[in-house]
């Protein structure tokens, strides 16, 4: 076993020195060893080199990494495998699988040195989806389901607020008004207070009016005015009278 470990280190040295083909051949041979503490990191490295050199496709590499993470558990090799797999899934547009694998790793091994990096990767992936627009290629209802399944990743503050409002606008654009209202109500009730809550509540009221639900629109308006000094916010101050008037007309 010690000899195999020495060879594994030598392969890493060859790669660091720029001799990737020789390193890959050594990793390939070591990946067939019977000892998991040798064959798993060897397969991890061999697959990475082959992918970098265009010898295998990203889906093929993802399949290898996915199988590898079940073979070797409990050390840095597993977490490195998971981080790479998460990146591959994201590049392939397999967002749910990416978030699933990253979240499960962080929950299972929170004290490992790389665990914090995985948590950061998970948060960044979620932000890329719902703040930077990577999820725009998904159907709105699919994006909503993905958001709800990982809603604990929604950041507090302005970024989280913007995520929810962007997603709600997408739902409104395809006439999914009930779903948009439910999303904004969750954000207003559970995650916001003060002026930010009032702004989201007015968006919620507008959607309820579009959906011909004036009572819910008025409830949203009244809940927002009870938690903040609306007069301090010009946007909210100018919208509320219009919303109340429209809600009264629909009633």
Name every feature range the model reports, one short phrase each.
Residues 1-251:
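Acidic, polar-rich low-complexity tracts and alpha-helical solenoid repeat scaffolds
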């Amino acid at each position: 076993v010690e000899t195999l470990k020495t060879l594994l280190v030598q392969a890493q040295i060859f790669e660091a020195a720029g001799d990737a083909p020789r390193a890959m051949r050594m990793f390939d041979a070591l990946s067939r060893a019977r000892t998991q503490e040798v064959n798993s990191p060897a397969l991890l490295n061999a697959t990475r080199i082959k992918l970098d050199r265009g010898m295998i496709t990203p889906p093929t590499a993802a399949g290898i990494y996915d199988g590898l993470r079940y073979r070797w558990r409990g050390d840095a090799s597993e977490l490195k495998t998971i981080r790479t797999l998460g990146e591959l899934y994201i590049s392939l547009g397999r967002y749910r699988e990416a978030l699933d694998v990253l979240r499960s790793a962080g929950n299972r091994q929170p004290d490992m040195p790389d665990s914090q990096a995985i948590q950061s990767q998970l948060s960044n992936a979620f932000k890329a989806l719902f703040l930077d627009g990577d999820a725009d290629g998904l159907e709105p209802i699919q994006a909503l389901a993905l958001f709800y399944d990982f809603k604990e990743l929604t950041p507090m503050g302005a970024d989280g607020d913007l995520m929810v409002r962007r997603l709600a606008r997408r739902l409104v654009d395809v006439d999914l008004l009930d779903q948009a209202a439910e999303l904004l109500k969750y954000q207003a009730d559970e995650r916001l207070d003060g002026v930010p809550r009032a702004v989201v509540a007015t968006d919620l009221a507008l959607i309820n009016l579009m959906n011909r639900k004036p009572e819910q629109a008025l409830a949203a308006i009244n809940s927002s005015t009870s938690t903040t000094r609306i007069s301090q916010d010009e946007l909210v101050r100018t919208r509320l009278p219009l919303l109340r008037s429209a809600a009264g007309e629909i009633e």
